[in-house]
Every structure is written in C-alpha cells, then in structure tokens.
Amino acid sequence: MQQYLTEARKLSALAVPVIIAQVSQTSMGVVDTIMAGAYSATDMAAVAVGTSIWLPAILFGHGLLLALTPVVAQLNGSGRRDRISHQVRQSFFLAAIISVLTMLVLYQGEYAINLMSNDSPELAAKAIGYLHALLWGVPGYLFYQVLRCQCEGLSKTYPGMMIGFIGLLINIPINYIFIHGKFGMPELGGVGCGVATASVYWIMMLLMMLYTQRASWLRDIRLHRPAFRPDFTVLKRLFGLGLPIALALLFEVTLFAVVALLVLPLGVVNVAGHQIALNFSSLMFVLPLSVGVATTIRVGHRLGEGSVDNARIAAHTGIMAGVALACCTAIFTTLLREPIALLYNQDPLVVAMASQLMLLAAVYQISDAVQVIGTGVLRGYKDTRSIFYITFVAYWVLGLPSGYLLALTDVIVPRMGPAGFWCGFIIGLTAAAVMMVTRIRFLQRQPAARILARAAR
C-alpha cells in the first residue's frame, strides 16, 4: 500500500501542472470564440468553422510528436540522458516535416469551408481568412510541443504549465489589438483571432526554447549535442510510435465532428443541448487526460529503471486515480447539470435537453477516464499500435454505428434523437476501456525481459 501512496504523490505532482497547461490551451480557443462573438455573430461563426478544420489537422501532428515523451522518460529512467538530445533534435526534424504538410492541408481547407458555408459568402471568406492566418502558427505550435514533450519526459511538467498560462494571458490583448485594429494594426475581426493565436504559438515556442537553454537541470543534456542532421533510423522509429497515437486522436476528433453534423438536422434545440453537454464534458475530460500524460511519464521512467513491478504499480495507480476523479466529476455533473446548463443558455427547452445529455455524460466518465489513462499506460509501454486498433474498433465499429441506430432509426428502439448518439458514446468508450485494460493485463503478464526489450526500442 505504501508503494501505491508514494506513486500517487509523484503522479499528482506531475498531473496538476499538466491540468493547468491543458486548461490554458483549451481556453485559448474559448477566448477566440468569445472575443470574435463580441465583434459580430458572423465572425464568431467563422472562427468556429475555421477551428473545425484546424483542430483535426493540428491534433494529428501533435499526436505524432507525443511519442517523444515515453522515449525521453525511458532514457532518463535508464540513466542514458546523453542520448536524449539526439531524440529531441530528430523530433524537430519530424515537426518541421509535419508543419509543412499540415500547412498545405490547412491552406486547402478553403474548399471544405466553401462546402460548409455555401449559403454565406461572407462567413466563408472570414473563416478562410482565419484559417490562413492561423496556419502560420503551425511550426511554432509543433516546435513548442517538442520542447514540452522533452520537459515532460524528464518529469518536469511545470514549464508547460507556466508557459501555457502566459500564452493564454497574452492571447487576450493581442486578440483585442488585431480584432479591433488598435495601435496602428488593421481591423481584422475574426481573422485577427487567427493572427493573434499564431503569434502566441511562436511566442510560447521562443519562451520554451529560452527556458530549455537556461535551465540548470538540462545542462548535462545540452552538453551532448550531436550533429544537427537527420537520422532516418530514429525518425522512422519516432514516426512508427507516433502514427498510431495520431490516428487514434484523429478517430476521436472526427467521431465528435461527424456526430455534430448528424445532430444538425434535428433542430436548434437539439444542436444547442448537444453542444452544451459536449463542451462541459470536454472540460471534465481534461482531468483524466492530464493523469494519463503523467502516467505515461511514470511508466516510461520506471521501465527505464528496469523495474517492471514498479511500472505496473505506476499504471495501476494512474487508473485508480482516474476512476476516483471520474466518480467525483460524475457526481458533480449529475447534481449540478441544470445550473451548469443555465450558464450556457436560458431557454428552458435547451436546458432540459442539455441536462438530459449531461446525465448520460456522467455515466460514461468512468469509462472515459479508464480508456484515456489506459492510452497513457500503453504509450509508456511503447505499445502504441494497440491504441490505434482499440480506438478504431471502439469508436467507429461500435460507438458510431450503435449511436446512429439508436438516434436516427427505429431498428432497436424508437428514435432517441441526440440521446441515442450519447448512448453510442457510452458503448464506444466502455468498449475502449475494457479493451485497454485487457491489453494492459496481457502486456504485464509477459516476461520481464520482453517488456524491457520493448521499452528500450
């Protein structure tokens, strides 16, 4: 028991800064939406449309780079800190390649926007402008993530917290300047949000780079600086570890995007209720997500130390902590669902719909916590391919089809509307949680030599 309590304290020390960093990053999008909405409804809608293209593309790139965290954690735990600098440099090469490809995809996003907004040329023009401004922040964002993954892999989560919070604070005045055209800048409206956010990503990257160049605890890593040229063996390994993570993120993001489109014909009340419930549950999701990041670090570090038993304790502690948090957030959501919905909208019909869906959200929070922390555990074991297969089956083979049948057909029960899709979320996330735990148990029963060999790849 003492081992679990000690591990829980270490996990908490890592997870709390990650929570603050994640909230800061999420809040930047909220700030963009609110400030664009204060300028005009069209600009707010343009930011929302542009973000719907931006988010899947940038999260895919982000997912590819997440492989660096367990790699650094394992090297740090095994005492091979002299090799970390080389892995980070290769991640910069990977980030540069991803940046170019992501920018090209986002630039072509205007075709999707024109299809989505064919009845409103003004909205389409503003959304395209926002996206084209924001795409220049892609390299800054991805380079920042490389440095953040390096710090987190070394069990230092405070730099990401502090710089993420600074980024949120400076995003507000820069937004104001470019939206309203202050201090000699052009008045860009919603497009100004894209300019501001892209600028903030570069500022965050420069601050993180300055920090990593000055931090005393990184001095020994800075001393080992191999030639700055691509190592295709390392690049291939990082890409191979990161691709399943990126695809899993893409599956999740596109699942919610597809459901939003399927709910759209069901009317304003259903759409508004769905969005309120989804927005709030996404905020609650930050807690287990952050525990999952911390669990990746702890499992990777323990495996680097050569301790399979301690890695198992770290994994179990992370999952138990996530379940405990999920129970608290589920109770909170259940008891306060109506007051929370009223914060978003005063329409009684919208509040009633949102409250109903938030009750379903409370049901799946435990499954959601187990699956996202399970993902973190598997990343720590460098078993990322299973993450890809599990998320694909859970979300697209089980979750979405069952949700569609329940929501829009009479095949199983009379049409449930949006609640049917949320029942599909419950089915998909529960299936993912069960498969994650099953896979983790399978890995942990393997011979120690095999587990450590996989971790050392």
Curated annotation (Swiss-Prot):
Signal sequence segment: none
UniProt keyword terms in alphabetical order: Antiport, Cell inner membrane, Cell membrane, Ion transport, Membrane, Sodium, Sodium transport, Transmembrane, Transmembrane helix, Transport
One function term, GO molecular function aspect: antiporter activity
UniProt subcellular location: Cell inner membrane
Record's bilayer topology term: Multi-pass membrane protein
One Gene Ontology term from the biological process aspect of the record: sodium ion transport
Main subcellular location: membrane
One Pfam family this sequence matches: MatE
Transmembrane spans: 11-31, 53-73, 93-113, 127-147, 159-179, 190-210, 249-269, 276-296, 313-333, 357-377, 387-407, 417-437
Source domain of life: Bacteria
A cellular component annotation (GO) from this entry: plasma membrane
Record family assignment: Belongs to the multi antimicrobial extrusion (MATE) (TC 2.A.66.1) family. MdtK subfamily.
Record's function text: Multidrug efflux pump that functions probably as a Na(+)/drug antiporter.
HAMAP family cross-referenced by the UniProt entry: MdtK
UniProt protein name: Multidrug resistance protein MdtK
Organism name: Pectobacterium atrosepticum (strain SCRI 1043 / ATCC BAA-672) (Erwinia carotovora subsp. atroseptica)
Originating gene: mdtK
